[in-house]
């Protein structure tokens, strides 16, 4: 079938070792739209959940996939066998700096500061 070649079977491994998939995806799909689909399929029992596509990185064969490229452009056919399920890793980069900066802004400034004087 010619239409079968347009599809790729992917499985996604999370940091804790659990998987999403395997499922078939069209190779013309962009990495960004794939990430949106993954956010909607994200396991509800997980503590960390990505909110946007920028909260996660997809890694295939050691390469970080770019959001604006298609799955066909992002594939590394050297590592693949026909009919094989490709495992990609998901790395979350959730915004933690906002919490730290809010904490620093909400903390009162230190009033007792040590001052050294050399005579």
From Swiss-Prot:
Covalent lipid adducts (S-palmitoyl cysteine), residues: 114
Origin superkingdom: Eukaryota
Modified residues (Cysteine methyl ester): 116
Outcome reported for the amino acid change (mutating residue 116 to S): Loss of prenylation and membrane localization
Propeptide: 117-119
Keyword flag Membrane: yes
Lipidated sites in chain (S-geranylgeranyl cysteine): 116
Induction: Not induced by pathogens, cycloheximide and ozone treatment.
Keywords from the named record: Cell membrane, Lipoprotein, Membrane, Methylation, Palmitate, Prenylation
Any Gene Ontology CC annotation: plasma membrane
Pfam families documented for this protein: Rad60-SLD_2
Tissues showing expression: Ubiquitous.
Keyword GTP-binding annotated: no
Protein function: May serve as docking site to facilitate the association of other proteins to the plasma membrane.
Further comment found in the protein's record: Heat stable and remains soluble at temperatures exceeding 90 degrees Celsius.
Name of the molecule in the record: Membrane-anchored ubiquitin-fold protein 6
Originating organism: Arabidopsis thaliana
């Amino acid at each position: 079938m010619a239409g079968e070649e347009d599809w790729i079977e992917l499985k996604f491994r999370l940091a804790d070792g659990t998987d999403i998939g395997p499922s078939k995806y069209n190779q013309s799909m962009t990495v960004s739209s794939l990430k949106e689909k993954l956010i909607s399929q994200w396991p509800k029992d997980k503590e960390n959940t990505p909110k946007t596509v920028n909260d996660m990185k997809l890694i295939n064969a050691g390469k970080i996939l770019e959001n604006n490229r298609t799955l066909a452009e992002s594939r590394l056919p050297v590592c693949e066998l026909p009919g094989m399920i490709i495992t990609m890793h998901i790395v979350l980069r959730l915004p933690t700096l906002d919490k730290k900066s809010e904490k620093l802004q909400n903390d009162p400034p230190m009033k007792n500061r040590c001052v050294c004087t050399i005579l």
